[in-house]
């Protein structure tokens, strides 16, 4: 089977009435959320496309961890806490398996001296063109017909991530992006997908984007023109049901936040 490979990375960049809408935080406005969704879910870092399509998982995710460095229990605890939160938000079955052969989501905790070799092996030679200034990386393989995500890889060089104060950020951002929110964009704020956001944890906007992505009415392969009316309908429902406001609580009380704090 042919695969389409997409990859992304964390960069070290330092740096409806009108009355009701005006009173809302920017991230809570439906039009802002819709725009952010299109920029984050329908565009790809380092890969251009003239026919963007939605991509998501439709099968259970089975994660296998490869540890090349110490503090294995701590690193895996962080990852498992975040994976549990992702499963809760998306309703995807996400489990950890003991054998690589049983996994469709490979997660490396490695060292900087090894990560280029791992990237070359797992993501291909071309992925090495985009590592300048990066801290960690993810890649996914898509079914070319359905556009469903079939496999994913997360690669975190722990020493490099720690030196930038980004270990938690790498764990959260790369695994979240590997679910289908591939692109970093300044159109999303506050968000882990915006390098100007100071917080490494999922924001309320991120939670809404994840929930939208895994709504059953949105399916892999959908084009922007098909998605737009469905998104608008969902956002109206979210607003009426209080889901937009609930996202703030879910962000503040994420398992990894309660364990490791902001």
Descriptions of predicted regions:
Residues 10-15:
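Hydrophobic helical h-region of N-terminal Sec-dependent signal peptides
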Residues 17-19:
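N-terminal signal peptide c-region/cleavage motif recognized by signal peptidases
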Residues 21-62, 69-71, 135-142, 248, ...:
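Disordered inhibitory propeptide/activation segment of secreted metzincin zinc metalloprotease zymogens
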Residues 47, 126-166, 182-262:
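Metalloprotease/metallohydrolase-associated module, dominated by Zn2+-dependent proteases
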Residues 69, 75-172, 177-178, 182-186:
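Metzincin-family zinc-dependent endopeptidase catalytic domain
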């Amino acid at each position: 089977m042919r695969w389409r490979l997409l990859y992304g990375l964390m960069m070290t960049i330092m740096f409806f009435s009108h009355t009701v809408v005006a009173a809302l935080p920017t991230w809570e406005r439906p039009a802002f959320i819709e725009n952010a969704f299109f920029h984050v879910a329908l565009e790809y870092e380092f890969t251009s496309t003239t026919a963007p399509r939605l991509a998501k998982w439709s099968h259970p995710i089975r994660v296998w961890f490869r540890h090349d460095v110490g503090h294995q229990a701590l690193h895996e605890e962080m990852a498992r806490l975040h994976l549990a939160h992702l499963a809760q938000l998306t309703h995807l079955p996400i489990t950890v398996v003991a054998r690589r052969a049983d996994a469709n989501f490979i997660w490396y905790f490695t060292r900087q001296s090894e990560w280029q070799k791992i990237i070359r092996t797992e993501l291909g030679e071309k992925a090495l063109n985009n590592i300048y200034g990066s801290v960690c990386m993810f890649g996914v393989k898509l079914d070319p017909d359905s556009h469903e995500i079939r496999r994913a890889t997360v690669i975190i060089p722990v020493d490099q991530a720690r030196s930038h104060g980004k270990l938690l950020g790498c764990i959260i951002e790369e695994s979240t992006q590997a679910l289908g929110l591939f692109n970093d964009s300044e159109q999303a704020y506050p968000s882990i997908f915006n390098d100007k956001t100071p917080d490494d944890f999922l924001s309320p906007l991120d939670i809404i984007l994840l929930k939208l992505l895994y709504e059953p009415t949105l399916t892999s392969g959908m084009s922007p023109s098909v998605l737009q009316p469905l998104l608008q309908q969902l956002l109206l429902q979210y607003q009426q049901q209080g889901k937009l406001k609930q996202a703030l609580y879910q962000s503040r009380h994420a398992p990894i936040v309660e364990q490791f704090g902001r």
